[in-house]
Each structure stands twice: as C-alpha cells, then as structure tokens.
Amino acid sequence: MRIDVLSLFPDMFSGPMHDSIVGKAIENGHLTMPVTNFRDYSTNKHGNVDDYPFGGGAGMLLQPQPIFDALKATEEQAAAEGLPKGRVILLDPAGVTFNQHVAEDFAHEEHLTFLCGHYEGYDERIRTLVTDEVSLGDFVLTGGELASMVMIDATVRLLPGVLGNAESAPGDSFSSGLLEYPQYTRPADFRGMTVPDVLISGNHGKIEKWRQKEALRRTYQRRPDLIDHDQLTAEQKRLLADVRIEEEERASRN
C-alpha cells in the first residue's frame, strides 16, 4: 500500500509513523508513506497557502492552488509505480466518524491520500478532489495531522503480513462487532488476583466459550449499543442471556 500525506507540518510524522507497527510495515515493504508539504507547491512568492475568506469572517482558509498541485504531483508519482489515484481523504470534523469498519474499508485500497488541513478550514473547491470526508469525533483539533496518524495506524495494522500474529487483528475490539474479552498473562496469581481457572485448563473449547461470553459481557456492560442481535449466533444469544441474568443478580446484591 502507498499512503500519501499532504500536510504543512511533515516533521510531525517523522517519529510516530516510523516506530512500532507502522514503522515495521514500512521497513518490511508492506507500506510506503511519503509526506508532502503542500507549501512547496505554492506559486505565491512568499509561499503563502492561506487567505481571508470572501464575505468576511474569522480565521484563514487554505487556498486551492497549492493543494491541487501537490495532489497532482503525488498522483503522478503513484501512477509511475503502477498505482491508481486512489481515495483522497479529507480530515474534517464534519465528516463521517472514523471507526473500525472504515479502517477495514481503507485497508482494501492500494493507494490512499490523507489531506491534513489547518487554520480555519478549506476553500470549498478543495472538496472537489476528495472521495471521503472523515472525522475522529465531535471535537475540533488544530490540524488534521494527529487525526490522520490515528487513521493510518488503525488501517496499516490490518494489512496482510503487518502484524506478527495473523489472528491479532480479527480478535481486536470492534473487529467482531464486540469489545475484546479480558486477557491475562503470567503469573497466574498476582497479589491475590488470580487468572480464571478455565484459561489454564487446556480445554480449548471451554476457553473459546469463555472468551465469547466475556466479550459479550464487556460489550453489554460498556457499549450495549454495539450488540446487533441479528448478527449474533444462536450460541452467542444463549451466552448473552446468561450474561444478562448474571449481571442482574450482581446488581441486586449491590
């Protein structure tokens, strides 16, 4: 996969995006991630990329010209590598909310471009370049850089061969539609807090059933809105019924 980033602050990506999983993906050839400063494409002699909005108002808007030209250049570079133009993602608080399903969708692409804004916003004509407008949530950041890093990390870890254990990503919270079940490592007894017996029983069938039940329990407790009953198997529905009874009994004791 190739991920292009258009940003006024490319140095922000030099650390986080070259460490851990994303860094290993680059090192192992699963990912290339050029970061382009679109100020370099400004035709203004002062290198300006923003201006006041027509009609007045607070703040400055990013001008279309530097971004149009920077995107054209990166798309030509991608084409030289045999890659399609790909999807152009505008980081915008008014966009659709990013989640695991969006990350999975992005992970199927060969080429993505993240457009990181700054200042008050964008000239509306920039949106003609865009295929997706995406937000991290109902809050405003100074720029799109931090949001794009989160989305890139969530996407890259889903690429085939990136994670050391191929089963890691499907087991993550939200990948199955449920939160992840509790996990434990050694020692089995730490300051009186013990690992559930089933996990050290060696009975893989019972372990899997326990994990399904505890994933349902955690989701029921913390994010019941995620539970789609139509998507649950008959076994999961039985386990969820047990969880509800147990949680009601626990609540009545408190």
Swiss-Prot record:
InterPro entries, alphabetized: Alpha/beta_knot_MTases, tRNA_m1G_MeTrfase_C_sf, tRNA_m1G_MeTrfase_TrmD, tRNA_m1G_MTases_N, tRNA_MeTrfase_TRMD/TRM10
Enzyme Commission number, as recorded: 2.1.1.228
Principal subcellular localisation of the protein: cytoplasm
Signal peptide residues on this chain, from the entry's feature table: none
GO cellular component terms attached to this protein's record: cytosol
Positions of disulphide bridges: none
Coiled coil, from the record: none
Gene3D superfamilies: 3.40.1280.10, tRNA(m1g37)methyltransferase, domain 2
GO BP: tRNA N1-guanine methylation
Keyword NAD annotated: no
Entry-linked SUPFAM superfamilies: alpha/beta knot
Positions contributing to S-adenosyl-L-methionine binding: G117, L136, G137, D138, F139, V140, L141
Cross-referenced HAMAP family: TrmD
Family: Belongs to the RNA methyltransferase TrmD family.
Record's protein name: tRNA (guanine-N(1)-)-methyltransferase
Origin organism lineage: Bacteria, Bacillati, Bacillota, Bacilli, Lactobacillales
